[in-house]
């Protein structure tokens, strides 16, 4: 007699629209704030990653490193060009991060139902990894065209509109869709899924796991939470960085008559053969600095959820 109501109550908790909506809001607001703050580093990282595949950047005009890029961008393109593509990035990142966080908690409920952390630690740990990876892969399917457009806008150099390849987000999507079809907006999607699972599994899983080991997870001091998040985002970013480099190189091919790479594997091989293994990590230090924004997202998300009095699911 008591089992059926309990089951319905569990289903209601699992698919609570109000809680899901608050998750979207909390994750989205935190993401928008942090991405705007680190937008200049984001652009430097993108340019260093794809300049070898960009027809707009000649070999002699390529950036020598992060410092050279930081100095030349305002001089050649204007100071506010550091935020070029930032609006598209915020639009893209809001649903991406919001969906990641929202789905993560729902997946946690699915994967971790009945799992005792003290008695089944490794099962609990793997459930955290699985929920993070599944959340990232699910949201990527929805927002990939926006991620693609943000990348192309971010590496579109030139001081004036007449020197740029795209006028804005809408123009970028329309031009690529017209020349390559919808498939062109999903160039590099396969390797993106691989990379996002690796990144999100460690990003969410390790953060939740480490925080869960603390005596009072919900009362963790801000600085401690930030330090944990910083270490997690740095390690996750370096681990998945080669996947990110390859996917962005693949993105650069859409809309081009002649393609440099036949596919993901060919891209991996050619980068290694012609540029060396270090090219997979070009811009990685910028990514470490950029990871500060990711760390802020994790911490702000918890604080925003506390503000809305949302249960953080045992963290």
Swiss-Prot record:
Nucleotide carrier signature motif (motif): residue ranges: 247-252
Transmembrane segments: 20-49, 87-111, 122-142, 191-211, 223-243, 284-301
InterPro entries for this protein: ADT_euk_type, Mit_carrier, Mitochondrial_sb/sol_carrier, Mt_carrier_dom_sf
Cited SUPFAM superfamilies: Mitochondrial carrier (SSF103506)
Solcar repeat start and end residues: 18-110, 123-213, 220-307
Pfam hit, one: Mito_carr
Regulation of protein activity: The matrix-open state (m-state) is inhibited by the membrane-permeable bongkrekic acid (BKA). The cytoplasmic-open state (c-state) is inhibited by the membrane-impermeable toxic inhibitor carboxyatractyloside (CATR). Proton transporter activity is inhibited by ADP:ATP antiporter activity.
UniProt KW Transmembrane helix keyword: yes
Domain of life (superkingdom): Eukaryota
Positions of region (Important for transport activity): 247-252
Disulphide bond pairs: none
Compartment annotation: Mitochondrion inner membrane; Membrane; Cell projection, Cilium, Flagellum membrane
Keyword NAD: no
Catalytic activity: ADP(in) + ATP(out) = ADP(out) + ATP(in); dATP(out) + ADP(in) = dATP(in) + ADP(out); dADP(in) + ADP(out) = dADP(out) + ADP(in); H(+)(in) = H(+)(out)
Keyword terms of this UniProt record: Antiport, Cell membrane, Cell projection, Cilium, Differentiation, Flagellum, Membrane, Mitochondrion, Mitochondrion inner membrane, Repeat, Spermatogenesis, Transmembrane, Transmembrane helix, Transport
Record-stated family: Belongs to the mitochondrial carrier (TC 2.A.29) family.
The protein's role, per its UniProt record: ADP:ATP antiporter that mediates import of ADP into the mitochondrial matrix for ATP synthesis, and export of ATP out to fuel the cell. Cycles between the cytoplasmic-open state (c-state) and the matrix-open state (m-state): operates by the alternating access mechanism with a single substrate-binding site intermittently exposed to either the cytosolic (c-state) or matrix (m-state) side of the inner mitochondrial membrane. Specifically required during spermatogenesis, probably to mediate ADP:ATP exchange in spermatocytes.
Recorded domain comment: The transmembrane helices are not perpendicular to the plane of the membrane, but cross the membrane at an angle. Odd-numbered transmembrane helices exhibit a sharp kink, due to the presence of a conserved proline residue.
PANTHER family: ADP,ATP CARRIER PROTEIN 1-RELATED-RELATED, ADP_ATP TRANSLOCASE 4
Annotated protein name in UniProt: ADP/ATP translocase 4
Organism (species): Homo sapiens (Human)
Gene: SLC25A31
């Amino acid at each position: 007699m008591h089992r059926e109501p309990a089951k319905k109550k569990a289903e209601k908790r699992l698919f609570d629209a109000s809680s899901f909506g608050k998750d979207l809001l909390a994750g989205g607001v935190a993401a928008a704030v942090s991405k705007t703050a680190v937008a200049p580093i984001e652009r430097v990282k993108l340019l260093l990653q794809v300049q070898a595949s960009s027809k707009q950047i000649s070999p002699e005009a390529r950036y020598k490193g992060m410092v050279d890029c930081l100095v030349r961008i305002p001089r050649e393109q204007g100071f506010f060009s550091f935020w070029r593509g930032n609006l598209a990035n915020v639009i893209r990142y809001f649903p991406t991060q919001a969906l990641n966080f929202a789905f993560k908690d729902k997946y946690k409920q699915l994967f971790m139902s009945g799992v005792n952390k003290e008695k089944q630690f490794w099962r609990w740990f793997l459930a955290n990894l699985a929920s993070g990876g599944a959340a990232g892969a699910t949201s990527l399917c929805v927002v990939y065209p926006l991620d693609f457009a943000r990348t192309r806008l971010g590496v579109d150099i030139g001081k004036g509109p007449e020197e740029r390849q795209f006028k804005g987000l809408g123009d970028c999507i329309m031009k690529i869709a017209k020349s390559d079809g919808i498939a062109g907006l999903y160039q590099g999607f396969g390797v993106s899924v691989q990379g996002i699972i690796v990144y999100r599994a460690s990003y969410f899983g390790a953060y939740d796991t480490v925080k869960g080991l603390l005596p009072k997870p919900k009362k963790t001091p801000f600085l401690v939470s930030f330090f944990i998040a910083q270490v997690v985002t740095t390690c996750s970013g370096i681990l998945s960085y080669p996947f990110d480099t390859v996917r962005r190189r693949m993105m650069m091919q859409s809309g081009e008559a002649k393609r440099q790479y036949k596919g993901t594997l060919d891209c991996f091989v050619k980068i290694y053969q012609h540029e060396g293994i270090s090219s997979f990590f070009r811009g990685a230090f910028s990514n470490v600095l950029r990871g500060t924004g990711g760390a802020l997202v994790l911490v702000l998300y918890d604080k925003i959820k506390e503000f809305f009095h949302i249960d953080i699911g045992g963290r």
